[in-house]
């Protein structure tokens, strides 16, 4: 999230740089100190007027450019700036002068996103400049793979600025889905008694603020800082150090949003080792696996409390997913997560070809099913014909068997009759012979 302190720091650095340039009286740079982008380590900290004078040599105004042309010019300027810094670093490795163009070369390594530190001040000013350089390290990275939404591509820079101005500073800020950003309200709530700064004009706004408010990129939210429990003793040793907040796992009560400064139930370092600085410390919890914040809460019954888990070193966006976690999910599972960053999903060919392929596939499936049904029907008819033939053969065999059985019985009965008829005449002849014999021979 772009804080108000960073904005004020950028304005003070620009004013100090202009005063330093007038004091040195360099030739060709009296009208504007930022004629060369190589003197800035991050072009996103420049205002639009400074970037206009440094880049547009042909006199073309940014207001007449489309947003596509504006982003292309920013990327070209960033590449030139990086090339100049590399060349200057290569030249400075051989011979490093004590003071060059009013800049202190010892502070050039303050960070890629920071603004260069001017010399000519005391040691305290150098320390303050180093701190401001570290604060400015949250500049926008190169968005070379970013695709603008279709309505935003057709608009000019002046039209986008007018929409931002009408919206009261929020404009089209927020994510690509159209949700407006609430950074101004959060900053006012955090700063409390600070007086509201005046609304910057078009030329005074930095490139980073303009791109964020226009909706080209998202804001990176700051790390949540939970308030201490009022029921506990106000002991300074229970305060969590700032260095340990990056490795903090907290479970917050009363809200589904982990950025809400609620009550922390348990904190700890994922490595499992205690960290104590300055004689104080905090109670360690057992090692917890890095969790993913989904923005929603878990309720236990009607009156349950909502809880959320925060992972280390993963700034949570407005939709509840960290930028690094989204990239890891897309790279691990091969899923195109471009829709979360405003990019449209690439369609596999024209719609007509897709429909034609589907129709051909449906026709092939129908033909295959018809062939299968025809084969099944032919097999059934063949089985029925074989069954009828077997039935006829079975009937013929049964009839032949019955005829054979009848003939066999008939022959048996005929044989029995032929055996019983010759015995009767023999018995009669014997009886006759016995009756003719005389009883005595006289």
From Swiss-Prot:
Residues 136-146 have a biased composition (Polar residues). The keyword Cytoplasm does not apply. The keyword Protein biosynthesis does not apply. Residues 99-109, 177-193 have a biased composition (Low complexity). InterPro entries: bZIP (IPR004827), BZIP46-like (IPR043452), bZIP_sf (IPR046347). The modification Phosphoserine is found at residues 42, 64, 145. Residues 1-37, 83-151, 164-201, 218-238, 414-442 are annotated as: Disordered. CDD domains: bZIP_plant_BZIP46. Signal peptide: none annotated. Transmembrane segments: none annotated. Predominantly expressed in seeds. Disruption phenotype: Exhibits abscisic acid (ABA) insensitivity. Residues 355-418 form the bZIP domain. Its main location: nucleus. Residues 383-404 are annotated as: Leucine-zipper. Residues 110-123, 167-176 have a biased composition (Gly residues). Phosphorylated by SRK2D and SRK2I in vitro. Residues 1-15 have a biased composition (Basic and acidic residues). Participates in ABA-regulated gene expression during seed development and subsequent vegetative stage by acting as the major mediator of ABA repression of growth. Binds to the embryo specification element and the ABA-responsive element (ABRE) of the Dc3 gene promoter and to the ABRE of the Em1 and Em6 genes promoters. Can also trans-activate its own promoter, suggesting that it is autoregulated. Plays a role in sugar-mediated senescence. Belongs to the bZIP family. ABI5 subfamily. DNA-binding homodimer. DNA-binding heterodimer with AREB3/DPBF3 or EEL/DPBF4. Interacts with ABI3, KEG, the mediator subunit MED25, and the AFP proteins AFP1, AFP2, AFP3 and AFP4. Interacts with TAP46. Interacts with the 36 kDa catalytic subunit (subunit C) of PP2A. Interacts with FYPP1 and FYPP3. Interacts with FREE1 (via C-terminus). This is Protein ABSCISIC ACID-INSENSITIVE 5. It comes from Arabidopsis thaliana (Mouse-ear cress). The lineage of its organism: Eukaryota, Viridiplantae, Streptophyta, Embryophyta, Tracheophyta. The gene is ABI5.
